[in-house]
């Protein structure tokens, strides 16, 4: 389960996509190609895309919805440990996080009331800035590292082609492996569309928005909350 563990650490959801067989599906996707070849080509195709969005559940990070560029920049939302949701903006040099009300309340609940009140005022609607390479950002860094996220797929053994299906209206072939189930587009580029693993740390990630522009805007300084300034 090495690959599944790597994916879990990197991320990147039951029912995140609508699946269903229809009578108009092709009868033989990727004729003459083994499941391992189809899966490897799917990983290569997605790695070659300029952008993509991954959404779903990654047990190491909870629910995620992140748009990732080829340069490692990303933006979106992640589930915050301890409660709530974090807005995310990651550039090459910095990571910016902005918590929602639930997250801020969870972070300040054990503070004395006067400190908690001031902290909530300071944090509400503002971004916390950190170095992109900060150890505390390792999980997010792995999620935004598209090559690191996908390259372990090449080492998966025992991949076999399965049934045809559809995901969000797009035809896909099921690739069954000992580590999980993968859905690969059968029309156009053979992009990887979904990854599902089970076990004690299950993940279920859908890949959409492939090659659609992602604009990562850095928050203005006035909207950034600097913890160092608060002692």
Describe the function of each predicted region.
Residues 34, 38-39, 150-153, 157, ...:
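Outer-membrane beta-barrel proteins
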Residues 71-142, 203:
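An acidic-aromatic
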Residues 163-223:
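Gly/Pro-enriched, hydrophobic low-complexity segments
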């Amino acid at each position: 389960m090495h690959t599944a563990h790597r994916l879990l650490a990197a991320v990147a959801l039951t029912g995140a996509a609508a699946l269903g067989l229809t009578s108009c599906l092709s009868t033989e996707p990727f004729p003459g190609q083994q499941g391992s070849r189809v899966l490897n080509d799917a990983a290569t195709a997605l790695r070659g895309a300029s952008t993509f969005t991954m959404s779903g559940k990654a047990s190491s990070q909870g629910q995620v919805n992140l748009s990732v560029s080829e340069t490692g920049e990303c933006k979106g939302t992640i589930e915050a440990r301890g409660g709530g949701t974090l807005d995310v903006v990651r550039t090459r040099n910095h990571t910016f996080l902005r918590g929602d009300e639930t997250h801020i309340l969870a972070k300040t609940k054990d503070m004395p009331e006067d400190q908690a009140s001031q902290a909530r005022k300071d944090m509400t609607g503002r971004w916390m800035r950190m170095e992109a390479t900060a150890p505390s950002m390792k999980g997010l860094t792995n999620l935004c590292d598209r090559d690191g996220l996908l390259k372990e797929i090449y080492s998966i053994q025992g991949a076999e082609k399965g049934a045809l299906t559809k995901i969000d209206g797009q035809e896909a072939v099921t690739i069954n492996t000992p580590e999980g189930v993968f859905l690969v587009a059968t029309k156009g580029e053979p992009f990887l569309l979904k990854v599902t693993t089970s076990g004690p740390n299950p993940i279920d990630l859908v890949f959409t928005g492939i090659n659609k522009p992602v604009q990562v805007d850095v928050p203005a300084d006035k909207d950034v909350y600097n913890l160092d300034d608060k002692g």
